[in-house]
Amino acid sequence: MPALHSPGQTTCRGHIQDPASQRLTWSKPPLNVLVIRKIRDETLLEPFKELCRFLVEEKHLMVYVEKKVVDDGSLMSDESFSAICNQLCTFREGYDDISDCIDLIICLGGDGTLLYASSLFQGSVPPVMAFHLGSLGFLTPFKFESFKTEVDKVFEGNAAIILRSRLKVKVVKGMFQRNEQLFTTQENGVVPHNHISNEAGKITLQLQVLNEVVVDRGPSSYLSNVDLYL
């Protein structure tokens, strides 16, 4: 997942690489921007409106937001924002697929908002620009006070980015009996790659997530068995 960021150190193939060498370039000018804001946080209402006004009126972009954001009573009651609100494109999580039409994601909130934005894209993720307006900000390096300048820099191209890996999660049910040899390890303690690829069963859920996965026992009284491979 490409995330726009402030200068800092990253590793690449065993050596320290200057992040300044990783840059975002546009093959064509971006047209569609997804704005994700932290829900049920009234302090983000004004920053959200400021950003949308800027993107629509000054940058002349198509702005996508969640339908539940537009349906917010505080937003709908603002008559001065109604003209902008009518130009916003809305979508519903789990119903509308916007994965192929978004050029850039802008997040307003904390790390949780960024993780949520990542979950909306189960394939390739557009570049993400995250403004720190939440409780945690390890993944949100931009300050909103200078949002116009920062957004302009991104649209001009050559902005610094960091590529973040995501985890692929599969829930498999109805597993067939696995051959005992699949449980053996090599001399160095590494489980052979075909241990997983040879497993058979019905995949009931598959997700790509950023940072972490929580395995919950659900209605069961205990978690019977966990196989973890790295």
Predicted feature locations:
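Short, acidic/small-residue loops that bind anionic groups at enzyme active sites
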Residues: 121-143
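Short beta-strand segments
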Residues: 36, 107-109, 116, 130-131, ...
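ATP/NTP phosphate-donor binding region
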Residues: 1-108, 144-162, 171-179, 188-190, ...
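Glycine- and small hydrophobic-enriched segments that form the cores of compact globular domains
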Residues: 96-106, 114-116, 126-127, 131
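Short, solvent-exposed amphipathic alpha-helical segments in soluble enzyme
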Residues: 49-54, 122-123, 229
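Short glycine-rich anion-binding loops that position phosphate/pyrophosphate groups of nucleotides
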Residues: 39-40, 111-113, 136
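Short glycine/serine/threonine-rich phosphate/pyrophosphate-binding segments
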Residues: 44-45, 112-118
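Catalytic core of DAGKc-family lipid kinases
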Residues: 135-230
